[in-house]
Swiss-Prot record:
This is Putative membrane-bound redox modulator Alx. It comes from the Bacteria. Belongs to the TerC family. The gene is alx. Residues 1-6, 65-89, 135, 220-225, 283-286 are periplasmic.
Length: 321
């Protein structure tokens, strides 16, 4: 697997992530179970975005010093494009978490605890998936066509799908987990497991955590191939992906109260997936430059938010009238 990642770059990335996770876990441990306020969520979202951009700037500077601008510029642009793709697609994941927490009546104070461990699990699972994907592409380059066709199909499916929380309990996976886990009927504070009559029982909070992890894996199956459309370098794919999901918890609490205001977002994300799928399918006939891909993704997001704002304005006006 060809990569610009040197031991220094890999080590620096690992140190930054470890320090930030340690700070996050330390704050979680000191404060105990509590809901993140909108102000805190906005502050942490800004911290994660700023840290991601600073890392990309340091990455670019390092490559300028070691490889030159001809290498540094496209690689830094690839990181930024991958980060934007993952960040935008992650919003749909946040909406699924909202449905899960609502269906299982998880108190806001406990949602943060679930998401702390959910993000930690996502880091491990996505790292495995990215290195596996990089290896497969290095061995079988035709697999990019499969990724492209899958993203094209997923984009169309996303635009046509209708999801609501009412059917979550009837999903085969949820029924299977409930049937095979020794589980209590109610949430017991912040515990994932409790002991009753000498036996260990999982609580519904553990079921929610499992579903959060599985939902992230499902979304990663979409988002990781999407970044492979930009670059197959495992260092850039992994770092851009993980920096994007590290801010997911703060994004969740930032959007939790206004999710219904983003009714058009799934259509914008669907268009992005279709564009990336087409980009992968035509790669042997025409290579779309990274800068163009970044511009298209950014443009789609801007247009989506403009249309969404107009739709909200019309709805608010109708309700007010």
């Amino acid at each position: 697997m060809n990569t610009v990642g040197t031991p220094l770059l890999w080590g620096g990335f690992a140190v930054v992530v470890a320090i930030m996770l340690a700070i996050d876990l330390l704050l979680q441990g000191r404060r105990g179970a509590h809901a993140m306020t909108m102000k805190q969520a906005a502050a942490w979202s800004l911290v994660w975005v700023t840290l991601s951009l600073l890392f990309n700037a340091a990455f670019w500077w390092y490559l300028v010093q070691t490889e030159g601008r001809a290498v540094a510029d496209p690689q830094a642009l690839a990181f930024l494009t991958g980060y934007l793709i993952e960040k935008s697609l992650a919003v749909d994941n946040v909406f699924v978490w909202l449905m899960l927490f609502s269906y299982f009546s998880v108190p806001a104070a406990l949602q943060r605890r679930v998401l702390v461990y959910g993000v930690l699990g996502a880091i491990v699972l996505r790292t495995i998936m990215i290195f596996t994907g990089s290896w497969l592409i290095s061995q079988f380059d035709w697999i990019l066509y499969i990724f492209g066709a899958f993203l094209l199909f997923t984009g169309v499916k996303m635009a046509l799908a209708h999801e609501d929380e009412s059917g979550i309990g009837d999903k085969p996976l949820v029924r299977w987990l409930r049937g095979h886990l020794r589980m209590t009927d109610t949430i017991d504070n912040e515990h994932f497991f409790v002991r009753k009559n000498g036996l260990l029982y999982a609580t519904p909070l553990m079921l929610v955590l499992i579903l959060v992890e599985l939902s992230d894996v499902i979304f990663a199956v979409d988002s990781i191939p999407a970044i492979f459309a930009v670059t197959t370098d495992p260092f850039i794919v992994l770092t851009s992906n993980l920096f994007a999901i590290l801010g997911l918890r703060a994004m969740y609490f930032l959007l939790a109260g206004v999710a219904e205001r983003f009714s058009m977002l799934k259509y914008g994300l669907a268009v992005i997936l279709v564009f990336i799928g087409i980009k992968m399918l035509i790669v042997d006939f025409y290579h779309i430059p990274i800068a163009v891909s970044l511009g298209v993704v950014f443009g789609i997001l801007v247009m989506t938010f403009i249309i969404n704002a107009w739709v909200n304005y019309r709805h608010d006006k109708q309700r007010g009238g």
